[in-house]
C-alpha cells in the first residue's frame, strides 16, 4: 500500500528536481545537475498578472530540444497521472480526480519554474502536461474497457 504512495511521491520529486534545474537541456546531460538560483524579484503576482510571460508563447525555435522537452512533458506527466489514478480509491470519478490532481500539480510546477533563474513557467506547458495526463488516462480507460468487454464476451 505504501509502495504506491512512495512511487508517486518520487515521481513528483523527480519532476520538481528537473523544474528546479536552470538552463536544462535534454540533449546535454551535463546540464541536468546545474545549481539553481531563486529569482528573488519574482512574486506570485508578477508571475500570474495579466500580460506576464507566463501567458506568452514560446520564444525559442521548433528544434530537436523543443520536441524532446514537450515529449518529456507528455510522458512524465502522463505517468504521473497514472500514478495518481492508482493511488485513488475505487470510486466514481477516479479518472477525473486523477486528471485534476495532475493538472493542479502541473500548474504548481510551472509556477515553481517561474521562480528559478534560467527557467520559465508557461501556461502552455500546463496545457501540454494536462494533455499528457489525459492521454495516458484515456489509454488506461480504453485498455480496461477492452479487457472488461473480452471477459463479458466469454460469458
Roles of regions detected by a PLM:
Residues 120:
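Sequence-specific DNA-binding recognition helix
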Residues 1-114, 123, 130-147, 151-155:
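Bulky hydrophobic segments
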Amino acid at each position: 500500500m505504501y509502495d504506491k504512495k512512495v512511487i508517486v511521491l518520487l515521481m513528483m520529486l523527480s519532476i520538481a528536481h528537473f523544474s528546479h534545474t536552470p538552463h536544462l537541456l535534454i540533449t546535454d546531460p551535463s546540464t541536468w545537475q546545474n545549481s539553481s538560483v531563486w529569482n528573488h524579484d519574482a512574486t506570485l503576482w508578477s508571475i500570474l498578472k495579466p500580460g506576464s510571460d507566463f501567458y506568452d508563447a514560446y520564444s525559442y525555435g521548433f528544434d530537436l530540444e523543443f520536441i524532446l522537452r514537450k515529449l518529456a512533458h507528455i510522458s512524465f506527466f502522463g505517468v504521473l497521472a497514472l500514478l495518481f489514478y492508482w493511488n485513488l480509491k475505487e470510486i466514481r470519478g477516479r479518472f477525473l480526480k486523477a486528471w485534476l490532481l495532475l493538472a493542479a500539480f502541473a500548474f504548481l510546477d510551472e509556477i515553481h519554474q517561474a521562480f528559478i533563474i534560467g527557467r520559465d513557467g508557461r501556461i502552455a506547458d500546463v496545457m501540454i502536461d494536462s494533455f499528457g495526463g489525459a492521454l495516458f488516462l484515456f489509454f488506461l480507460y480504453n485498455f480496461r474497457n477492452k479487457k472488461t468487454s473480452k471477459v463479458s464476451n466469454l460469458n
